[in-house]
């Protein structure tokens, strides 16, 4: 928000439109991106999502324009939907013989610790430039995607048949 107000100079209506754009993108892309995870690969879906999220962050931090912020929100929303549900499904498939509740709790705890560390580091980096933490986080997302592509195992994935995924007929 500080970046949007101080650097991009968005007004209250534009701020609302930025948030709405992200939410609409997530809503629209949720089902089509879920098909990638169910038919092709959870790992592929996660990696695509992490890359797109990183690209969205880099785009948003690099170009201080309302239009580019909106485009970045769409890219970020698309990335978010590739990740949504895929991580949990991947864990459930890869660790099916273990206590999933404990795994999910440990993951949530690690996420909270990472958030606190990220906030502190972002605050320090923002003293140089408000846009820098956004760009750095985007680059880190892309590095994470490369790491996941190289080292994330996917041994128990079973593809769903495309005809089993017709969500609109089931509704």
Regions found by a protein language model. Name each.
Residues 1-14:
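Short amphipathic helix-loop junctions that connect adjacent transmembrane helices
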Residues 1-2, 18-37, 41-56, 68-126, ...:
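Substrate-agnostic recognition of the 12-TM MFS/MFS-like secondary transporter fold
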Residues 5-7, 35, 63:
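Short, hydrophobic transmembrane alpha-helix segments
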Residues 9, 41, 62-68:
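Helix-breaking motifs and short loop linkers at transmembrane-helix boundaries and internal kinks
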Residues 12, 66, 70, 167-171:
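Primarily residues marking transmembrane-helix entry/exit sites
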Residues 61-67, 127-132:
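Transmembrane helix interruption/hinge and helix-loop junction motifs
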Residues 132-150:
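Symmetry-related core transmembrane helices of the 12-TM Major Facilitator Superfamily/SLC fold
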Residues 151-171:
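Juxtamembrane intracellular "pre-TM" segments in multi-pass secondary transporters
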């Amino acid at each position: 928000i500080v970046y949007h107000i101080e650097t991009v100079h968005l007004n209250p209506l534009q701020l609302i439109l930025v948030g709405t754009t992200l939410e609409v993108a997530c809503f629209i892309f949720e089902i089509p991106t879920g098909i990638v995870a169910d038919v092709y690969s959870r790992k592929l879906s996660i990696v695509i999502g992490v890359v797109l999220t990183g690209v969205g962050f880099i785009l948003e931090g690099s170009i201080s324009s309302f239009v580019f912020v909106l485009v970045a929100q769409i890219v970020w929303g698309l990335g978010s939907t590739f990740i949504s549900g895929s991580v949990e499904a991947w864990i459930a498939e890869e660790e099916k013989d273990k206590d999933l509740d404990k795994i999910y709790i440990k993951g949530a705890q690690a996420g909270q610790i990472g958030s606190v560390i990220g906030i502190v580091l972002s605050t320090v980096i923002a003293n140089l430039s408000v846009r820098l933490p956004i760009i750095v986080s985007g680059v880190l997302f892309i590095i994470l995607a490369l790491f996941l592509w190289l080292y994330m195992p996917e041994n128990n994935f079973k593809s769903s048949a495309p005809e089993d995924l017709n969500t609109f007929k089931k509704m």
